[in-house]
Amino acid sequence: MLIHGSWHNAWNWHKVVPLIEAAGHRVICIDLPGMGRDKTPVKEVTLQKSVAKITEVIDQQPGKLILVGHSKNGIMVSQAAEYRPDKMEALVYLAAYLVPDGKTQREYAVQDTGGVLKPYVIFDESTQSTTLDPVIYKEGLYADCEDDIVEMAKLLLSSEPVNTGTTRLELTDENFGRIPRYYIECLEDRAVTPYKQQKMYMELPCQKVYQLKSSHSPFFSRPEE
């Protein structure tokens, strides 16, 4: 089950899904609340609503899942796993926020002073959401991707709810802590820098860390890997 990152939706995974299916696996991609085709008003989106949508889909599956999260929404992977530990085979964090119990994604994001996105994040107080200035798409998100991905992003990226990143995670060793987790570090990432990625997986150690010589979006630039 593949969980997209900030401002994105299920279209993230359109290059990797056929490859995973060709290897004999079933793949599930969803739009989180307020994103993509999900029509929840972005102002009403909370961490709990987002996690509830994930766990609802998890509950419909007959067996265990590998839950994969990108970027900010590593937090969704962790919180959903806490609520459904018996349904989890493993957790995979792709350049994702791996945040411990009692902390928020925002706390970790503000520490990442080497990233290039912050000056281009536009806050809308009326909807309590942000958008990203398209001028930074290429450099910040898709540096090693084809130009058509940037053009698609201009059409498909949407507002990102702020609330989800400012809500503290509630994780326990008994549930979240017993599920094997793996990290995929993107070595040329300018959105979630390698420094920040390393700091997170050293604080919450993983079974194994894989490294990709890629920017923030390897599902576009290196889908086979």
Regions picked out by a protein language model, each given a short descriptive name:
Residues 26, 34-68, 82-83, 106-110:
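Active-site loop/oxyanion-hole signature of alpha/beta-hydrolase fold enzymes
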Residues 187-213, 220:
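Conserved loop-alpha-helix segment in the C-terminal half of the alpha/beta-hydrolase fold
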